[in-house]
Each structure stands twice: as structure tokens, then as C-alpha cells.
Amino acid sequence: MPVLACCVDAAAPPGYAFAGDISFPAPIAFTGVPPATADDTNNSNNHWSPSLSAALYNVDGWGGPYFAVNTAGNISVRPHGSDTVSHQEIDLLKIVKKASDPKSLGGLSLQLPLIARFPDVLKNRLESLQSAFDYAIQSGGYESHYQGVYPVKCNQDRFVVEDIVKFGSPFRFGLEAGSKPELLLAMSCLCKGNPDGLLICNGFKDAEYISLALVANKLALNTVIVVEQEEEVDLIVELSKKLCIKPVIGLRAKLRTKHSGHFGGIFRRRGKFGLTTARVLRVVKNLDLAGMLDCLQLLHFHIGSQIPSTALLADGVGEAAQIYCELVRLGANMRVIDIGGGLGIDYDGSKSCDSDISVEYGLEEYAAAVVHAVQCVCDRSVKHPVICSESGRAIVSHHSVLIFEAVGTSSTNGGGAPPALSAHYLAEELSEDYGYLSELAFRGDYETCLVYTEEMKERCVEQFKQGTVCMEQLAAVEGLCELVRKAVGAAESVRRYHVNLSIFTSVPDAWGIEQVFPIIPIHRLDEKPSVRGILSDLTCDSDGKIDKFINGESSLPLHEMEGGRTYYLGMFLGGAYEEALGGVHNLFGGPSVVRVSQSDGPHSFAVTRAVPGPSCGDVLRVMQHQPELMFETLKHRAQEYVSHDNAAALLAAGLARTFDRMPYLLSLSSFVADDVAAAVPAAQDLGEQWSY
């Protein structure tokens, strides 16, 4: 059926008016399917269900066992993972309401974007990791134990680190630091932890760093100074003798096993960290000459983050275990093998080893592969070492959700209702184009229809550049082309959803390394998504967008925005790195944060901590501005240019509120503009002109 005639008929479409005495060819009458109506949309939703949305967004794949779609069509958090019973689930939409509602309605008056942290999820991740290694050790007859450390670089938030130390204390969980401030916070937190928990000191080191690590040892913290560079050995020897503190030393080996993915770069032979075989031998010799070879007790290595397969993992661990055995043979007092990070997260739920955003294994398979690889090598001649891992990404990724609003949409084509055409010659040209398009539609040549409309638009653009076509005419032609695209059944253009967020601040890896995170609506999942969209942030930067999604998609199924109803989206599995890496591009600061725990009662939760995001004044201070002085300058300016005292005071009050609010967009209902509105007529009554 020539569907063009269904949308283009004898009367000009709304928004079109052709000037001149032009007679258009009568459209060919065709019967066909009528356009969709509201009833059709309702029928579509009647056949939709939350379970279909769960399948569409693959929630069970990437979110299990911590996230699910509930019967109300909202995302629920399952705080205890697989052990969560149905009445313990927490509805994310209820958390948003609690956080954002005004205090007069029992809310917390927090502005979005919002990070919701779930310490119960954090606890479950720690326990699950420990259980996986415990099972692998017991079932395989391994003759030592596992005790992990959390690398604080993944998320240095005070309460995250303190929770990990608290939850990990029963199984001697420790911390890893890679800089002096990280070491200070690790030392402080571990004072309340298990005394057997390891404090691993990685990273580049100067005399102050090494002295601080030695002091940690003196404070009865189980501290290991890991040699990353050969030159560090001399400093460790010199300072330990000067301070009369015997150190525990580890060394980081640079392996030959290859991890070819994006996250394997630091592991390659030209990588940033680690000692080659020759340098390892020199370190051993130097420690022996200093009479401190017995201090060498730990071997550390790192294959790379997001290790995709257990085969690659076992290969690297096996190589490192052989180095460990050689160090024992050379006389070192070896006790611990630290396998570093690499325990991956399945960001898209595909369980694939061919992607940087997925892994083919779970916690149990990972632990079994590590234990078996170490055991196979050490069974030859060496006592089984304590196994340590630095699995930060796997521990904290699931524990937080970033929630943000969509504040508007636009077509990526710039389509819209066109204005009237007013030039006689253009109408004649359109008449010829219309006749040709009708002929193509009659023949069913819809592909040529699309090609011709694009050519027509290009001709009009060239005429516009030459000044022979005005902007209204150009817009009208673009609108006609969009109508034709829809009429012939072309795929609807992708919408741009404008979100109240800074990608650079809250999802920096999406911009920096094109990392893909699962992003989905957190509500309305009982409705069928009717459009596809990309996300565009508030920054004045073309890179401030997300147009890559899980499963290789370049757009995301979304719902039509409804007037007066906020549309909330959530980014999941972003609990590692994103907060620490985020900047203040365009002076947008971080999100508000709530800490949410499951409490007694069906679907009950408690917000145990709530922190508003940085205000405009806060982010200005980051760049060395002085908001208090800025406010005084503007206040004096208002007094100078607004002669009415009350009006000047009201304007100053409005400025003060802006300094105190977050930089993100406010809904009109949240914006208290009464004082400013009162100031404007007062000034106008005095005959003053407002300039902008």
C-alpha cells in the first residue's frame, strides 16, 4: 500500500500553508491502517508487564541478585542478595520520594541527582566473596586461608570504607592504599578493624610514604610495604634501620601472561608497575645483603581489571605461583600471595569473555580457579600461602545507584511542526516534488522516497546558504521530509533525552573510556517503552552524552515523557571509581547521597544518612573562588542599581539562595521565586529599566 497517501493528502498538514495560486495533484486514495490512537497505546500497555520490561532491559542478567522489577513496575533493591525475602525488597521510587519530598511532607528536601547507597548490599558482597573462597579452599583441600583487602581507590567515601572494615572484621578483611592520604585513612579505619587484617601499601613511594607505612607497623597494624620500583628497596632498608622498625616487605612482579582487553594495559610488559624477573632477583640480592631477606613475605601481581575468563586468570596465577615458589627457594620468608584485582563485573549480563564489560564467570568460579592454580604449583614443594585479593570493583560496584531525572526531550533530527511557506517559487518546486513522491508511493518504492526527501532537503539547505531561502521555508521542508519518513514507515528518529546530570561528574568513565553501565527507567516498567533515546547532560560540551548502552545498543528504550510527571532513570553498577574520578566540568558538583538500610516491616527502609550535594558556593570554592566575597560584591551592586531598599534586599536574598543550592536544574515547584518576583514590580514602579 502506498502509505505516503495516508499522511499527505489534499489539505496541507498542520503547520503548512503554501502561498500562491498553486494546484497540487490530488493524492491517490488508499485505504490502510489508521494512525495510532490513545486507545491503541492503552491496548499495548494492557499487553505489557513488568516481567517483559525485566527481559527487555536484561535486569536479571546484570542486576541479579540485587536488583529486580517489582509488580508495581518499579525497580526494587534486594539488599541481601539471594537471601532476600520478598518483604525485604526496597522500592527505589519510594527512596526518591523520601529524599526529594519537602520536609513539610516528611521528606528530606534533597535535590537530584541522587546516589543511594545500600550498606546491606556491601555486606552481602563481602560475605559472598569470602564464602566463595572458603568453599574453594575446603572442597579442594587447600592448606591455608583467604583474606582479602579492599583497595580504597575504588571508592574512598568514609562510610563505604568504614563499613567494609566493620563487615569484614570477622574474616580478617583489610585495606589497600596507593597514596599517602589513602594510607592515612586506611590506618585510621583499621584501628577499629581486625588486627590480623592486612594493610597493603602499593603505589609510588618516597621517604615520607615509607616512613608512614613503618609507623603503621609500629602501631600494630599488619602492614606490608610492596616494592613497585627497584629504587624503593634502598629507602625501605635505610628508613627501617633509622626508625628501628622491622618492616614486612612485598614485591610486585610483572608477569608475561597477556590480558589483551582495555583493562589489561597495566599488566603488559611495558606496563606502569611491577618488577621484571631480573629486577626481582636484584631486589632479593639487595635484601639479602642488608640482612633483611626474611622481611620479604608477600608476592603481589595484577593481571588487570575485568579479567574476562578463568582460563586467563588461571594462567596468570599459575605463573605468579611459580615466582612465589622461586622466592621461597631463594630464601625469602614467603607467606602471602596477593593476586591483585581483576575479579570482574558483568555490566551487561551477557556472561561473555569477548567484551570489556562482561565476564564469563561468577564469584565461585573465580575463587575455584585461583585456589586450584596456586595449589597445583605449590603442591610440588612449597607450603600453601595465604591467598589475598584486591577485589574492589566486585565489592562496591553493586552497592550504589545513581538516580537522575529527564527534564525534556528533542529529536536528534531537529524535526518538528514546520511553519508556513511563503515563497511562490518554492511552492511550485514543492508541487513537483510532491507529485514525484506520490508516484513513488503508488509504486511502493519507499526506499527511493526516503532518498529523494533527503536530496530535497539538501537542495533547500544549499539555497538557504545562498540566501535564496529563508529560515521558515527551510524548517517547512525539513518538516515535510520528517512527515514522509514517518509515512513510509521509516524508523522513528532517536530522541534526545535531556537529563539533570553531568556525565563528567557522575559517570566520567562513560566519557573517558566509553565504559558502558546499565541505565534504565526505575519506574513505569509496567508500561511498554514507545521511543528510543540517547541521554544528553546539562554541560555545555558535545561529549556530555551517553549514546552507548548494554548489548551494543546505540539507543535506549524509553517512555514518552508526560506533562507534570517526573521521569526517573537509574545508572547501576557504578559504585566503583565513578565518584572519585568525577570532576567539576561547568562547575557541576557531585550528587546528593542517601544511605539506605533495610528495616523491620514489609518493604521498609531507613535512611541512616543524608547529605545534600555540593552547592554552587561549594564548587566555586574548589576553583579558588570566594563565594562570600562574591556575594558581597553582588549585594553592593544590587544596592547601587536598585534604588528601592526592599527590592535590593529581596534580590540579595535570591542571590544567597542560589549560592546555597546545587548547580542542577530545579523544578518550578521547588524554586521559591516569590521574593524575586516581588522585587521586579517594585523596581518597575520606580521607572527603572532592567537590562540583561
From Swiss-Prot:
Cofactor names: pyridoxal 5'-phosphate; Mg(2+)
Catalytically driven reaction(s): L-arginine + H(+) = agmatine + CO2
This protein's UniProt keywords: Decarboxylase, Lyase, Magnesium, Putrescine biosynthesis, Pyridoxal phosphate, Spermidine biosynthesis
Keyword Protein transport: no
GO molecular function: arginine decarboxylase activity
Pfam families the UniProt entry points to: Orn_Arg_deC_N
Enzyme Commission identifier(s): 4.1.1.19
InterPro entries xrefs: Ala_racemase/Decarboxylase_C (IPR009006), Arg_decrbxlase (IPR002985), De-COase2_CS (IPR022657), De-COase2_N (IPR022644), De-COase2_pyr-phos_BS (IPR022653), Orn/DAP/Arg_de-COase (IPR000183), PLP-binding_barrel (IPR029066)
A single GO BP: putrescine biosynthetic process
Record-listed N6-(pyridoxal phosphate)lysine modification sites: K153
Binding site for substrate: I337, D338, I339, G340, G341, G342, L343, G344, I345, D346, Y347
Taxonomy, superkingdom: Eukaryota
Pathway as given in its UniProt record: Amine and polyamine biosynthesis; agmatine biosynthesis; agmatine from L-arginine: step 1/1
Membership in a protein family: Belongs to the Orn/Lys/Arg decarboxylase class-II family. SpeA subfamily.
Record-linked PANTHER family: ARGININE DECARBOXYLASE, ARGININE DECARBOXYLASE 1, CHLOROPLASTIC-RELATED
Protein name: Arginine decarboxylase
